[in-house]
């Protein structure tokens, strides 16, 4: 029986140190599913593990891509599963760690695959949105995929106010002639491993304090210079992220440096709240306080593997 020990939790909670301790305990590798840490040009602002940490266990999917490459969650799923198959042939226990819930889910449950849509369809939808606003997209989705519209309305109503998501739903409907919901993964994907999910949590005040400290450390380590180097490419998808966006606004003279740093802290706190919301929905997670003794966590994992 293969086991994938998956460590989840918000940013700055201590997932890296726990994953390394477990990798040493089980003599195995670590798969990173932190989508911000894939890119080699973004090191400080994404809190990539230090060289010392990376030397303590073999890590995969850290700084292995360039911001100039298009890399999707579907690509990651394929590559991660291929890598896990290879690793499981040597050791039946492996570790996955990261704060990107969508990417973790893709490995654990499979990712919905959508056909490519012609760019001109997207352009037309964009024009309609520019002219008629979000109501146009809401009406269109209700008309083209009533089932999915109702599902969003009942489960996640704020999505109806998100133009990017709504345009995506409508373009899939118009580009394929089928409802968006027909492409969602209805079949249970079977994996060749059993998952043990360990979640780390802390009180909000502690979390926020850790985030503020981490941002200060990033600034001291040279985040400003890293962002400045990336500034000419600021419109790339990979760079539309906390820690860089705010400094680009400083370079644009929209923010003072102090204000940009405060915005990074505020937006990272918001990001961590969204992570917590996502992870709290993850079934069968065994939650531990961020200061929990590693030996206790190992004990629980070993018990799970015996059953």
UniProtKB/Swiss-Prot annotation:
Keyword terms: ATP-binding, Magnesium, Nucleotide-binding, Transferase, tRNA processing
Quaternary structure annotation from Swiss-Prot or TrEMBL: Monomer.
Catalysed conversion reaction: adenosine(37) in tRNA + dimethylallyl diphosphate = N(6)-dimethylallyladenosine(37) in tRNA + diphosphate
Gene: miaA
Site residues (Interaction with substrate tRNA), renumbered to this chain: 100, 122
Pfam family, one: IPPT
Ligand binding (substrate): 11-16
EC number assigned by the record: 2.5.1.75
Residues bound to ATP: 9-16
Region (Interaction with substrate tRNA): 34-37, 164-168
TM ranges: none
Function according to Swiss-Prot or TrEMBL: Catalyzes the transfer of a dimethylallyl group onto the adenine at position 37 in tRNAs that read codons beginning with uridine, leading to the formation of N6-(dimethylallyl)adenosine (i(6)A).
Gene Ontology annotations of biological process type: tRNA modification
Organism: Flavobacterium psychrophilum (strain ATCC 49511 / DSM 21280 / CIP 103535 / JIP02/86)
Cofactors, names only: Mg(2+)
Entry's family note: Belongs to the IPP transferase family.
Record's protein name: tRNA dimethylallyltransferase
GO-annotated molecular function: ATP binding; tRNA dimethylallyltransferase activity
